[in-house]
């Protein structure tokens, strides 16, 4: 793929032609086009054609960076007092049908003393989105921004509901629904946390997506992030084989590969993690925070261990597992969930 032009701006029709020709748009060009979309100043037919052209070509890193910068300008920001802030929002789209692992990891990490702003939405391609399961757990997902900010400062965790905090997305809802396929916007959620997360444990559904997201984060303002893709296809830390992790820090990238042994845990096949719907996912999370042993617990311990290592709370994954297990066994995780639902 090549950069389409040195021209800092392109019309929608020109951008569509360039993308259909296999040319990547620059960050500046993409940003201007996304900005027009989010202001409601773009023709819906051209928006759809451009999104499809980018999808068919394959979204470039420059396009992700430009789109993320534009989307961040339009989001409702959540103010807070934390210097270190974690998000566990991933791209979704793995089709694995598991319970909401990243949501459980977010709550457990908060119980371990890490400030967390969990960004998420209702289900799109999965059986249960983070907003759906949190609603089943009694969390008020549509709180006003000042309430979200207060919750983050007071108890160290909040839920940033994408549908509420990205109001400009209303301008592209119709065309995305008509297209009915994943587009550039499906990759932007993890890059646009309304609270400005400094650290991200970010799962991706495909190796090529993992590489693009990591490269985009290196150009954006992440302090340190782990971009994940598991050998079994999960967009999480997996205990079913190897998990690839690209560590992004200070604009540089470093590759890691983790196995269950690195966590001191036994393998878990992803079939053991299935959840049919949000209520079942919520019940799994309640039970594991209640102390139930087994595959669900071990998988969340592994994810939390990675999060704790990411923010510098521990120096090893096995130490992270020990601290996360203590947070469950002491009922700190259960208490944190109750606080979040109050």
From Swiss-Prot:
User: What protein family does this chain belong to?
Assistant: Belongs to the anthranilate phosphoribosyltransferase family.
Cofactor, free-text remark: Binds 2 magnesium ions per monomer.
Binding-site positions, Mg(2+) 1: 102, 236
* Root EC class: transferase
Gene Ontology cellular-component terms listed: cytosol
Q: What is this protein called?
A: Anthranilate phosphoribosyltransferase
Pfam families from the UniProt entry: Glycos_trans_3N, Glycos_transf_3
Function of the molecule: Catalyzes the transfer of the phosphoribosyl group of 5-phosphorylribose-1-pyrophosphate (PRPP) to anthranilate to yield N-(5'-phosphoribosyl)-anthranilate (PRA).
Name the residues that bind anthranilate 1.
Answer: 90, 121
The gene name reads trpD
**In the record, what terms sit under GO molecular function?**
anthranilate phosphoribosyltransferase activity; magnesium ion binding
Catalysis performed (reactions): N-(5-phospho-beta-D-ribosyl)anthranilate + diphosphate = 5-phospho-alpha-D-ribose 1-diphosphate + anthranilate
Enzyme Commission no: 2.4.2.18
* Binding locations of 5-phospho-alpha-D-ribose 1-diphosphate: 90, 93-94, 98, 100-103, 118-126, 130
Q: Where does Mg(2+) 2 bind?
A: 235-236
Protein species of origin:
Rhodopirellula baltica (strain DSM 10527 / NCIMB 13988 / SH1)
Q: Which UniProt keywords apply?
A: Amino-acid biosynthesis, Aromatic amino acid biosynthesis, Glycosyltransferase, Magnesium, Metal-binding, Transferase, Tryptophan biosynthesis
**Matching InterPro entries:** Anthranilate_Pribosyl_Tfrase, Glycosyl_Trfase_fam3, Glycosyl_Trfase_fam3_N_dom, Glycosyl_Trfase_fam3_N_dom_sf, Nuc_phospho_transferase
Pathway listed for it is: Amino-acid biosynthesis; L-tryptophan biosynthesis; L-tryptophan from chorismate: step 2/5
The cofactors named for this UniProt entry are:
Mg(2+)
Q: For binding anthranilate 2, which residues are annotated in this chain's numbering? A: 176
- Record's SUPFAM superfamilies? Nucleoside phosphorylase/phosphoribosyltransferase catalytic domain (SSF52418), Nucleoside phosphorylase/phosphoribosyltransferase N-terminal domain (SSF47648)
């Amino acid at each position: 793929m090549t950069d389409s032009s040195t021209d800092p701006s392109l019309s929608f029709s020109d951008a569509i032609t360039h993308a259909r020709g296999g040319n990547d748009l620059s960050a500046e060009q993409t940003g201007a086009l996304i900005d027009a979309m989010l202001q409601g100043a773009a023709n819906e037919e051209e928006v759809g054609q451009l999104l499809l052209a980018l999808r068919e070509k394959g979204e470039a890193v420059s396009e992700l960076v430009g789109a993320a910068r534009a989307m961040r300008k339009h989001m409702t920001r959540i103010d807070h007092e934390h210097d270190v802030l974690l998000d566990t929002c991933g791209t979704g789209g793995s089709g694995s049908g598991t319970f909401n692992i990243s949501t459980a990891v977010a709550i457990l990490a908060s119980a371990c003393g890490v400030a967390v702003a969990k960004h998420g939405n209702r289900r799109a391609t999965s059986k249960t989105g983070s907003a759906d399961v949190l609603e089943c757990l009694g969390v008020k997902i549509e709180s006003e921004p000042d309430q979200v900010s207060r919750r983050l400062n007071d108890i160290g965790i909040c839920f940033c509901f994408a549908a509420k905090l990205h109001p400009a997305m209303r301008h592209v809802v119709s065309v995305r629904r008509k297209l009915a396929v994943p587009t550039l916007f499906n990759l932007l959620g993890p890059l646009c946390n309304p609270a400005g997360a400094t650290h991200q444990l970010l799962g991706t559904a495909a190796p090529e997506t993992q590489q693009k997201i990591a490269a985009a984060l290196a150009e954006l303002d992440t302090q340190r992030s782990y971009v994940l893709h598991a050998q079994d296809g999960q967009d999480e830390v997996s205990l079913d084989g190897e998990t690839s992790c690209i560590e992004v820090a200070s604009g540089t990238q470093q590759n890691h590969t983790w196995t269950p042994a690195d966590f001191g845990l036994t393998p878990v096949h992803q079939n053991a993690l299935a959840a049919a719907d949000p209520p079942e996912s919520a019940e799994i999370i309640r039970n594991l925070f209640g102390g139930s042993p087994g595959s669900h617990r071990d998988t969340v311990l592994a994810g939390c261990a990675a999060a704790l290592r990411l923010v510098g709370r521990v120096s090893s994954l096995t130490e992270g597992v020990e601290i996360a297990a203590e947070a469950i066994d002491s009922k700190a995780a259960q208490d944190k969930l109750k606080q979040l639902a109050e």
